[in-house]
């Protein structure tokens, strides 16, 4: 089966082609440089760029995959969560293709796509497993059983990625904040500041990062000279400690031997390294996708569509910016 994946939920325009589980092409056009001067994604600008970028990205994806339009068997598109204008661009394009080619259409939850991205690297992955889903807009611990996804815990305020962006702004760094903090943190002392770890010792699996962000702000206000590298490193350590403590706690509590990372923040090398250290210590299998499958891409939407397609087409898909699992 040839599956076309389309992803336009935020500021990446992405199209991928899969033959069953094999990637034939995966093309991503990023808008980071467009939004950098605004310090974050501007929804209207994002939608307009998707409109102009999507036809080009689509053409490149087909060309790289060496297929024609008529070779497509299934169209898989993100329908939420995300920016409504951005989502509508991808959905409208996918619906038009579905009608023109008379090929089935399936809508995919963006978060589910991040989970299924792991199947691109680990095709033999079998439930049950625990997922740390951590991105700019979402931070959740998920329990995967067969095709059922149970949310064990989630952030009660800021997502981890949001906290990175906000602390980066406090430090006067660029956008996106996560990579900027990671970049300077490698030159800092991660024990220079003992920032709080909200909910670290709570019995549940929920997160809270707004207090940590505020603690960073108050700490900086008290300093005459801001050691940015040390602040970034200490903040990164605090976030990582919280995320991994809760994730591996969930795995042990549920007696599950496999932990999977997913989402854009899972591209953070410090997080990946610490997760590997803990997994070895605890004797738990850790699976981490390559960085290109952590950040937004359409291959994850295509693989999710391939695995979840039940033979029925859904042309009634609508953009759901606040879609939950």
Swiss-Prot record:
UniProt keywords (A-Z) are: Acyltransferase, Cytoplasm, Iron, Metal-binding, Transferase, tRNA processing
Tell me which Gene3D superfamilies the record gives: 3.30.420.40
GO terms for molecular function, please? iron ion binding; N(6)-L-threonylcarbamoyladenine synthase activity
Any idea which positions bind Fe cation? 110, 114, 296
What's one GO-annotated cellular component?
cytoplasm
- Which EC number(s) does the record attach to this protein? 2.3.1.234
Compartment list: Cytoplasm
Quote the InterPro entries the UniProt record gives.
ATPase_NBD, Gcp-like_dom, KAE1/TsaD, Peptidase_M22_CS, TsaD
GO BP: any one term: tRNA threonylcarbamoyladenosine modification
Role noted for this protein: Required for the formation of a threonylcarbamoyl group on adenosine at position 37 (t(6)A37) in tRNAs that read codons beginning with adenine. Is involved in the transfer of the threonylcarbamoyl moiety of threonylcarbamoyl-AMP (TC-AMP) to the N6 group of A37, together with TsaE and TsaB. TsaD likely plays a direct catalytic role in this reaction.
Protein's recorded name: tRNA N6-adenosine threonylcarbamoyltransferase
